[in-house]
């Protein structure tokens, strides 16, 4: 009888140990194509530049409704409407022959690819292709309705202060 109890307890102990030590099979993580996302972000920047250079900033679909843009020497622009108004005021005050371009340097993608931080370089040139303003920027994109939109952005000129 004692032998049966000992065997039963030993069996119960071993089964409990096996259940406790059994590691769950993890599902393979979805493969995120960082280069493809970088191309997608660069395409958004190219579209933004083309729209801005055309003088039609009000049709920019780049920003989330709750976006915030941090500019140098200014209070943050809160909301898509305020950002577009700021961009329109810049278009009105700039030389119409100036053109802006953006280059995506790096992207940092979240594990689920729903957020992307972009680090890039911008350049504004005049009609003779001479740079009049250059600098760097960071943008936090979030995926909403299947598309990346800018939620937060900031930029800094690397031109000397005049």
Locations of the language-model features?
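Polar/charged side chains located within well-ordered beta-strands of beta-rich proteins
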Residues: 45, 69, 90, 104, ...
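Sequence/structural signature of outer-membrane beta-barrel proteins
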Residues: 125-127, 159-160
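Generic short beta-strand segments
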Residues: 119-125
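A solvent-exposed, acidic/Ser-Thr-rich amphipathic alpha-helical stretch
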Residues: 35, 40, 56-114, 121
